[in-house]
Amino acid sequence: MFRGANAISLDAKGRLAMPSRYRDELVARCNGQLIVTIDAVDPCLCVYPLAEWELIENKLRELASFREENRRLQRLLIGNAVDLELDASGRFLVPPRLREYAKLDKRAMLVGQLNKFQLWDEDAWNAVAEADLAAIKQPGALSDDLRDLIL
């Protein structure tokens, strides 16, 4: 399970180092094999261990292909998916096209989302986190299920 928000840096080639606290789990779960693709809702990237991504591919494969919204989602997620592997130093290279989509430069945030990570530009992450916090404080902003979840 991946949790927490980690400030990380991209080097001039677009490589970033996976925080050490996740490396052993990623090597154990998927031999360091990752899939990175765009997030279809937020201006960030999603980084999946290979096995988690394969579950998503199976779900996408089962969608009715005659529905335009299904094809659209398949094109976005699968069409932008790139296979990556952690190198011996625990780094991986984010392709230029995906860096451009998420507006990644030097400072980024790797945010654990249980079964995957989101990779954000640091300024964009800070703005979204602040807006999310303000939104959930609004009266009626949370469903009963979410209110019961908050400790």
Swiss-Prot record:
GO terms for molecular function: DNA-binding transcription factor activity; transcription cis-regulatory region binding. The keyword Lipid metabolism does not apply. PROSITE patterns: SPOVT_ABRB (PS51740). Keywords: Cytoplasm, DNA-binding, Repeat, Transcription, Transcription regulation. Residues 5-52, 81-124 form the SpoVT-AbrB domain. One of its GO terms (cellular component) is cytoplasm. It comes from the Bacteria. It holds the Pfam family MraZ. It is found in: Cytoplasm, Nucleoid. Its main location: cytoplasm. GO terms for biological process: negative regulation of DNA-templated transcription initiation. InterPro entries: MraZ, MraZ_C, MraZ_dom, MraZ_N, MraZ_sf, SpoVT-AbrB_dom, SpoVT-AbrB_sf. Forms oligomers. Belongs to the MraZ family. This is Transcriptional regulator MraZ. It comes from Ectopseudomonas mendocina (strain ymp) (Pseudomonas mendocina).
